[in-house]
A protein has these predicted regions:
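A contiguous active-site-proximal alpha/beta segment in oxidoreductase catalytic domains
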Residues: 131, 138-216
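Conserved S-adenosyl-L-methionine
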Residues: 269-274
Length: 298
C-alpha cells in the first residue's frame, strides 16, 4: 500500500484532472439517505466507539449492517456478538476494507479507525460511491483535510464528522444560555480535559499480537516494526505515524466548545506551550511536605 505522502500527491493530481470514473451502480443511484428504503452500512474499526455507534445506527429501522471490519480478529468477534445480541442477525466479517469499497451494495461506511486511516478511508469510500460517517479528527493533518474537502465536493457524498458534543442536548442548551447572556458577556474560555488513563508504555520492539494484521493497520502510513501495545489506543501517542496526540483526541472536542461559546470563527494565531514529559521509573519523585499542626500536605 502506498504511503500517505504518495497518496496525497497522486489523488490531488487526479482530482485536478477530473480523471476519476464514477463506480456507482444503478441500485446506488436509487438509494437516498433518509428514505424508507433499506440502507446497507459497514463498520470499519470495531474498538471503543462501536457500542455507541452501533446503537445509534440501529435506532433507524431501515439500517442493515452488511459488514463488520477490523484488522484485529478479536475486535471482529466482539462486534459480531454485540450485533447479534442487539438484532439476532449476523453480518459479514472482513479484515480488508478495500473489499468493502468494491461492494456496490454498501451505501455508507461508519469509520472509527485510528486517525491515519480517516482521510484515506473516507476518500476511497467516496470514490467507490459511498457516504461516510467519520470519527474525529476528520484527518491526520491539514493537507489531508483539504484533500477530503476536494473529494466531497467532487463526488458529492455525505461526509459527517463525529464531533458528538455539537449534537448533545446538554451542550446545545448551555450554548443557548450563554448566547442569551445568562452569564454576562463572554470574553474568555478555558478548555481542559481530565482523565485517569494509565501511563503510556515506553516503546519497545515486540511481536505482533495474535490476530492482528499489522500491515493493514499501518495502511497509508510509513512502515515500521511493531512496538509494544501500539495497536490498542496507544497508537495515539507514538510519534505522528498513526495518531494526533491529545490535539486530535480530545482538544478537537473541547476547543470546539470553547470557540462555540465565545461565538468566534477560526483563530488568527495559535501559541503552544508544551513539554515532552515522561517517567522512566516508578520510583518516588522528590516532593514537598507541609506540616499543618497534625495534618500534612505532601
Amino acid at each position: 500500500m502506498k504511503n500517505r505522502r504518495s497518496f496525497i500527491k497522486k489523488t490531488t493530481l487526479s482530482l485536478a484532472g477530473i480523471t476519476f470514473l464514477n463506480s456507482f451502480s444503478a441500485k446506488s443511484y436509487r438509494k437516498i439517505i433518509g428514505s424508507n428504503e433499506r440502507i446497507n452500512i459497514a463498520f470499519q474499526g470495531l474498538g471503543r466507539r462501536i457500542p455507541g455507534l452501533m446503537s445509534g445506527a440501529l435506532a433507524y429501522k431501515n439500517i442493515e449492517v452488511s459488514y463488520l471490519c477490523d484488522v484485529m480478529d478479536n475486535q471482529v468477534k466482539k462486534a459480531t456478538e454485540r450485533y447479534f445480541n442487539l438484532t439476532g442477525k449476523t453480518a459479514k466479517s472482513e479484515k480488508n476494507i478495500h473489499r468493502i469499497f468494491e461492494d456496490k451494495d454498501v451505501d455508507a461506511i461508519i469509520m472509527a479507525t485510528p486517525d491515519h486511516w480517516h482521510a484515506y478511508g473516507a476518500c476511497k469510500a467516496m470514490e467507490s460511491g459511498k457516504h461516510v460517517y467519520l470519527e474525529k479528527p476528520c484527518s491526520h493533518n491539514m493537507n489531508e483535510s483539504d484533500l477530503l474537502l476536494d473529494y466531497q465536493k467532487y463526488f458529492k457524498k455525505v461526509v459527517q464528522m463525529g464531533n458528538q458534543q455539537r449534537s448533545s442536548p446538554h451542550t446545545i442548551e448551555l450554548m443557548q444560555k450563554i448566547k442569551d447572556g445568562e452569564i454576562g458577556k463572554t470574553y474568555k474560555s478555558t478548555a481542559f480535559y481530565h482523565s485517569n488513563r494509565p501511563r503510556v508504555p515506553n516503546q519497545v520492539l515486540a511481536s505482533v499480537p495474535q490476530g492482528l494484521n499489522w500491515n493493514l493497520f499501518q495502511g497509508p502510513a510509513v512502515r515500521r516494526e511493531y512496538t509494544y501495545d501500539t495497536w490498542d489506543y496507544n497508537w495515539r501517542w507514538y510519534d505522528w505515524d498513526y495518531g494526533t496526540g491529545e490535539a486530535g483526541n480530545n482538544a478537537t472536542h473541547e476547543l470546539d466548545i470553547a470557540r462555540w461559546a465565545l461565538g468566534v470563527d477560526y483563530p488568527h494565531k495559535v501559541d503552544v506551550y508544551a513539554g515532552c514529559l515522561l517517567y522512566t521509573s516508578d520510583a518516588a519523585d522528590e516532593g514537598l511536605g507541609v506540616d499543618l499542626g497534625g495534618r500534612r500536605i505532601i
